[in-house]
């Protein structure tokens, strides 16, 4: 009888050791995966940071380089006109600089088409929504949005908590 007890205790101990060993391996694998993920995320962030400054620097650099080259090569009288055209497009949204800078044919041409199209688009939207509202109000099943069950014949019985409990 003593030997059976001994073997049973040894079997249990071996099972415990095996479980501990497996748990330790799983923890090590998880830690390695977490470290790999962290490293991968850091690499991605670093690569994004490397790409973003280049993009940010590359976009402003060509206009700056063009301005410097245009300022270095031409005379000072040409520098002022080259600086003025970039300053002219931002004032265009305001009405006063448009009248002063441009004779008037170019800015009014883009503005009149949006004005007629905007009221027509608004009218279309209001007509469309009124049609949708009429269609919604004419639907027989949606009398009150707060109703628990619309008046429709769907073929399914209304699910209630008592029905659900009774099914089990």
Swiss-Prot record:
Residues 124-138, 145-168 have a biased composition (Polar residues). Residues 16-50 form a coiled coil. Residues 23-168 are annotated as: Disordered. Signal peptide: none annotated. Keywords: Coiled coil. Residues 31-52 have a biased composition (Basic and acidic residues). The keyword Methyltransferase does not apply. Residues 83-94, 104-117 have a biased composition (Pro residues). Residues 70-82 have a biased composition (Low complexity). This is Coiled-coil domain-containing protein 200.
